């Protein structure tokens, strides 16, 4: 009986301690405890590393961009040339667009549409954040001319329509900054060249038709819309505004038909309790948000 009992004890499996592996071989223990790794495993790891290195060394093929229209800079399948004027608009005003570098490659930018509607010698785009007489003598000369205006809202800005009525020299050039509001502010205040032209702003009640991009307030306009309104005032021709807005309307309509959503202004979202992002902790930014909620001009 005792011998049978001993046999049963020997046949019963020994309970493994928690966390122990099924294999208690020395190699397994060493792997578990961070000890020496078997040669075969080490060779396999080195082979994997070599394969990964070879993959990194392979030449990277550049992403293929869709063919673009040479006139409107839109992909050929969604070309907006049918909505552009057959010939560039005849204007006497020179337009300078100061474009922030971040805007240059944005898909839904409006400056190429604006430039496609105007003569090349009347519309010039300068890309950058800092400008000086040494870097851009042409722009420096333009800024110092008495007939040059810069369109940027502010307490010191004159209303454009009122200014041209009283100005002894009729404006021949207008400068517009292209970028987000924070980018435009940075360009305007950190370039002393832009202190020379007369600062003007638009006094208009129209709402932006650029509904596929969020604006800070209901009164903010895109660069193309600002140029359309300003040129129609300076040229005393409302047809200019209608013509320049046509490709913008087509762009927004096409995007909305293909899944884009109407982007309401931040002011509208705040006033109607629809703003879902957390309020900023920075006091200066928080103050701006409060001004937007109270429809105070900032």
From Swiss-Prot:
Pfam families, alphabetized: DTW (PF03942)
One Gene Ontology term, aspect cellular component: cytoplasm
Subcellular location: Nucleus; Cytoplasm
Transmembrane regions: none
Positions of post-translational Phosphoserine modification: 132
Modified residues (N-acetylmethionine): 1
Main location: nucleus
Assigned keywords, A-Z: Acetylation, Cytoplasm, Nucleus, Phosphoprotein, S-adenosyl-L-methionine, Transferase, tRNA processing
Catalyzed reactions: a uridine in tRNA + S-adenosyl-L-methionine = a 3-[(3S)-3-amino-3-carboxypropyl]uridine in tRNA + S-methyl-5'-thioadenosine + H(+)
Disordered, as annotated region: 1-52
InterPro entries recorded: DTW, DTWD2/TAPT
Record EC number: 2.5.1.25
Keyword Cytoplasm: yes
Molecular function terms from GO: tRNA-uridine aminocarboxypropyltransferase activity
Span(s) of short sequence motif DXTW: 178-181
EC class of the enzyme, as a word: transferase
One Gene Ontology biological process: tRNA modification
Function description: Catalyzes the formation of 3-(3-amino-3-carboxypropyl)uridine (acp3U) at position 20a in the D-loop of several cytoplasmic tRNAs (acp3U(20a)). Also has a weak activity to form acp3U at position 20 in the D-loop of tRNAs (acp3U(20)). Involved in glycoRNA biosynthesis by mediating formation of acp3U, which acts as an attachment site for N-glycans on tRNAs. GlycoRNAs consist of RNAs modified with secretory N-glycans that are presented on the cell surface.
Family, per entry: Belongs to the TDD superfamily. DTWD2 family.
Name of the protein in question: tRNA-uridine aminocarboxypropyltransferase 2
Organism this protein belongs to: Macaca fascicularis
Gene: DTWD2
């Amino acid at each position: 009986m005792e011998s049978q009992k001993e046999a049963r004890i020997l046949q019963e499996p020994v309970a493994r301690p928690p966390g122990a592996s099924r294999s208690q071989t020395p190699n397994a223990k060493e792997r578990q405890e961070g000890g020496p790794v078997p040669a075969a495993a080490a060779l396999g790891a080195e082979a994997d590393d070599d394969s990964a290195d070879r993959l990194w060394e392979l030449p990277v093929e550049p992403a293929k961009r869709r063919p673009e229209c040479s006139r409107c800079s839109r992909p050929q399948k969604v070309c907006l040339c049918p909505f552009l004027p057959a010939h560039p608009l005849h204007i006497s005003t020179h337009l300078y667009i100061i474009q922030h570098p971040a805007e240059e490659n944005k898909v839904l930018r409006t400056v190429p549409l604006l430039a496609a509607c105007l003569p090349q010698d009347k519309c010039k785009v300068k890309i950058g954040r800092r400008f000086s007489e040494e870097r851009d003598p042409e722009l420096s000369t333009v800024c110092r001319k008495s007939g040059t205006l810069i369109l940027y809202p502010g307490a010191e800005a004159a209303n454009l329509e009122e200014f041209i009525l009283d100005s002894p020299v009729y404006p021949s050039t207008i400068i517009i900054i292209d970028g987000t509001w924070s980018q435009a502010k940075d360009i305007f205040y950190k370039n002393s060249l832009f202190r020379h032209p007369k600062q003007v702003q638009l006094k208009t009640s129209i709402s932006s038709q650029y509904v596929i991009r969020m604006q800070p307030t209901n009164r903010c306009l895109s660069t193309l819309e600002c140029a359309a309104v300003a040129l129609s005032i300076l040229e005393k021709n409302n047809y200019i505004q209608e013509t320049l807005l046509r490709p913008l309307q087509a762009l927004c309509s096409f995007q909305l038909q293909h899944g884009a959503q109407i982007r309401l202004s931040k002011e509208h979202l705040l006033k109607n309790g629809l703003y879902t992002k957390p309020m900023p902790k920075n006091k200066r930014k928080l103050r701006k948000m409060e001004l937007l909620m109270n429809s105070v001009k900032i």
